[in-house]
Curated annotation (Swiss-Prot):
Catalytic reaction annotation: RNA(n) + a ribonucleoside 5'-triphosphate = RNA(n+1) + diphosphate
Location of region: Disordered: 50-82
Family of this protein: Belongs to the influenza viruses polymerase PB1 family.
Domain RdRp catalytic intervals: 286-483
Subcellular locations according to the entry: Host nucleus; Host cytoplasm
Name by which UniProt lists this protein: RNA-directed RNA polymerase catalytic subunit
Example GO BP: DNA-templated transcription
Amino acid sequence: MDVNPTLLFLKVPAQNAISTTFPYTGDPPYSHGTGTGYTMDTVNRTHQYSEKGKWTTNTETGAPQLNPIDGPLPEDNEPSGYAQTDCVLEAMAFLEESHPGIFENSCLETMEVIQQTRVDKLTQGRQTYDWTLNRNQPAATALANTIEVFRSNGLTANESGRLIDFLKDVIESMDKEEMEITTHFQRKRRVRDNMTKKMVTQRTIGKKKQRLNKRIYLIRALTLNTMTKDAERGKLKRRAIATPGMQIRGFVYFVETLARSICENLEQSGLPVGGNEKKAKLANVVRKMMTNSQDTELSFTITGDNTKWNENQNPRMFLAMITYITRNQPEWFRNVLSIAPIMFSNKMARLGKGYMFKSKSMKLRTQIPAEMLTSIDLKYFNESTRKKIEKIRPLLIDGTVSLSPGMMMGMFNMLSTVLGVSILNLGQKKYTKTTYWWDGLQSSDDFALIVNAPNHEGIQAGVDRFYRTCKLVGINMSKKKSYTNRTGTFEFTSFFYRYGFVANFSMELPSFGVSGINESDDMSIGVTVIKNNMINNDLGPATAQMALQLFIKDYRYTYRCHRGDTQIQTRRSFELKKLWEQTRSKAGLLISDGGPNLYNIRNLHIPEVCLKWELMDEDYQGRLCNPLNPFVSHKEIESVNNAVVMPAHGPAKSMEYDAVATTHSWIPKRNRSILNTSQRGILEDQQMYQKCCNLFEKFFPSSSYRRPVGISSMVEAMVSRARIDARIDFESGRIKKEEFAEIMKICSTIEELRRQK
């Protein structure tokens, strides 16, 4: 039968059709090879935007640095980083005038956070530049390595466990004449295998001590490693992102804490909230502009785009902002917060792995590391790369590039939002002193601007004034990429607004389906995604029911667990049929064991094990929820887990789902090939770290324990806890006298060993 597709839309309001315009199916593009080229692009662009600034040389590291601040005034149309300090300070002052006490309160809040934050805050986060090994590591390992090196160099403030004390060590480390570090290296030798009599390569891992002088240590402490941003849709070219080292991270965290606290109290800020809360906040601003405009007034909204936001921002401006925001605060607090922008003004960008060369015959491949780019003959490179390298050479020091202007991606999102909002704030009539006025929304580099005026000339004048005001603080609104609509229709951070925010359900499509963690988690994540979309994204009941059926089908095909009474033949069907036949209550079998689906849109919030528990055969219950089941090494029981879901656009979101641990919550074993590489020493360190933490959790079983504050170490805390527990158990008759004596003896031995060490 032929259906005219336009009929589908007869009854649908235009804004609901947005989900049909979705272009992103299939996998997003990933980057391969090195990010060196992209990083060079970033560095060269950043310097180009600030090229009329003043050049100076850093006395400590010898790095050439470009400072565009308070230099020439910015020009129309050309993006530039020529911010003016007094303009930024004035914008801050007006922001404070419109929000009395906002800075004062945020400072007090931040001071409290600083006093309480533990150093393990820095273990959150993914890859981190590890300065001791000069490459990326998981955050926890990088922190452990840094602390280990600090302690072996006599920096011990960090032992209190407070982040602020660790940062004292960081400051002190920068004054030391040299730092001694331990590096892992790998020896290869050819030996004859006794069994097969063949020659094999034997690898041994060694550790060696290395001394870094002050200059080299400073360069490493100020280094941001760079990687290529993966999975970006809708871009032809890849781009570079930065991962800072442990010296910078703690300072950035405190600055962002302050800025986050300010953003929470600014109605125009799209950060730090998200989801529905963000939509409500933004809808308020639009409503305000609509109701405050007189009937005769025109109101237009610009869906804004800024040119190269972070390459035109400048750490020196952030320093000025912080100096102003904290002006009446204690000296120590002002110092702690000003260190991050100062470090960023002196930052070095690591160029990554370098370039890969292949010979014409493709027989030979060789890697030119970034360190060699200073000396290598440029005839080997193509035209565009040659230009890049020539530009960057004067800035190179040991494979890192001096990059004073610019911020690198994703570093000061909150603080830069405060700067953006301070310009939106200047749109009030009392500041514009004329007939036009503006307001808007800002979230990191994304903005929407609402301008009201009596006529079109007024609107144009308002937009021009906004554009030029932004220029003065280093924000470059792109005239080519921003567009204007009558207020009521605009886009902001991938939310589309048309008389209210439109649910764009298709954005969530990539997160439907089977995640591939394990049978238990996948089932839970799958139904939670459907549930969340019913709550947040206008996924209707009929569509949700269909999504659920498709998910179950997908799940059964992924894990080859079709119903026990099906005709479909798979590798597992023989076993599952047998289980089906010997199960009395077939409804109690999990879907992953060939059972039926009991899910519908009303019970998506219940984990499958709980849903079917009463229906299960007793022996099946016993096998399913048995932590001692020898065939499965499974996860500890946690009530709530986090999954990372990828929407089509925007950052990966963390989503909570209920996790009931069963024998289906298995963990795949680690690939063994890592054990033969130089990573092995690091892996062993990591496992040791993990073991210590697990042991500690055993002594303090409730996860709500207050971590031992003060100077007691983990070992001391565990020993004293063991003594207390043993005494209680002995006095209540739970353990015998001999056992009690033995525990006390072990505790004394441990303390003795610590003293000798």
